[in-house]
A protein has these predicted regions:
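Short regulatory "switch" loops immediately downstream of catalytic or recognition motifs
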Residues: 22-29, 56-61, 141-144, 206-208
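Calcium-coordinating acidic loop motifs
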Residues: 10-12, 16, 48, 79-82, ...
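Repeat-based blade/solenoid architectures
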Residues: 1-7, 59-77, 110-125, 174-190, ...
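Hydrophobic beta-strand segments that make up the repeating blades of beta-propeller
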Residues: 19-23, 89-92, 137-141, 202-206
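Residues that flank catalytic or metal-binding motifs in active/ligand-binding sites
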Residues: 2, 17, 37-40, 72, ...
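Solenoidal tandem-repeat scaffolds enriched in leucines and small polar residues
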Residues: 24, 38, 71-78, 91-94, ...
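Beta-propeller blade repeat segments, especially FG-GAP/WD-type strand-to-loop junctions
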Residues: 27-55, 93-107, 145-172, 212-233
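Residue-level signal for WD-repeat beta-propeller blades
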Residues: 13, 37, 46, 70, ...
Length: 264
């Protein structure tokens, strides 16, 4: 078993951070077809003694505790798309809804059927793009997705409408990356108000599919104030020298590194 992305946040509402690790499954013989069997996500919840308790059983999997059948969570994000004030989880293209005490159930719309339709995303983000109090759901597809003929888009935003009826949210297509359709790997994404207009923008750490993981590129997506994301990389981050031959694996973070009031 192995994990790739962590979410650290207060899941059980006790004021202390907890830890979620999304499962990328259990590697098995390729003779089984998938090469990956389900394996449970990992959840550590803080207790009154200030210690962590292994609480993975708190996550519904519809598979007798053996792990969700989506198998491969290359992604994981925490946020509040249902607007109830606690931290939900989005991993493996399934939304895990928190009851406020650190127990997670699978959302009735963003469930295994949704995963089968859109497959496992390579990267994802929960962020309130239109300032309506509900975190929107953003995800980028793998370049080698099995359903490319039916799903040629590189990624989507599920844009909230001021309600928690996610099945009614508008689905917008994300701008493609610089290396071409089905040739771009969207490793990691982060949000922040880059242009100080009061709306969250997004940056994406990107690399090539071929040559494999060759080049490290940062895509800058600017929010228009209504939740639409426009690719303004060419104007805002020019001369990316590492985009040619730097190793493309890595994370991306948005912070004010030099304390000048502007996000880096």
């Amino acid at each position: 078993p192995f994990a790739y992305r962590l979410v650290v946040d207060d899941f059980n509402g006790d004021g202390l951070d907890d830890v979620f690790a999304g499962s990328m499954g259990l590697s098995v013989s390729q003779q089984k077809g998938w090469g990956i069997d389900p394996y449970p996500h990992f959840l550590l919840l803080s207790n009154s003694l200030g210690k962590f308790e292994e609480s993975s059983v708190n996550i519904e999997d519809e598979n007798n505790g053996l792990g969700q059948l989506c198998r491969f969570a290359h992604d994981a994000s925490g946020g509040d798309p249902d607007g109830d004030g606690d931290v939900d989880l989005f991993a493996c293209n399934m939304l895990l809804v928190n009851d406020g005490a650190g127990n997670f159930t699978i959302h009735p719309h963003l469930n295994l059927d949704w995963h089968y339709k859109y497959a496992s995303p390579m990267s994802r983000l929960l962020a309130d793009l239109n300032n309506d109090g509900f975190d929107d759901i953003i995800f980028w597809n793998f370049n080698d997705r099995r359903n490319f003929d039916l799903l040629p888009e590189e990624g989507f935003v599920l844009l909230s409408d001021g309600t928690n009826e996610i099945q009614n949210w508008k689905k917008n297509t994300l701008p493609p990356g610089p290396f071409g359709i089905n040739q771009t790997k969207y490793n990691h994404a982060a949000s922040g108000d880059l242009n100080n207009d009061g709306y969250l923008d997004i940056v994406v750490g990107i690399t090539r599919a071929d040559p494999y993981y060759e080049g490290a590129y940062v895509q800058v997506l600017i929010n228009d104030g209504a939740g639409a994301l426009n690719d303004e990389t060419s104007a805002r981050f020019v001369n990316q020298e590492r985009a040619t031959n730097h190793h493309g694996e890595g994370n991306i973070y948005v912070r004010d590194m030099n304390l000048d009031g502007a996000l880096d």
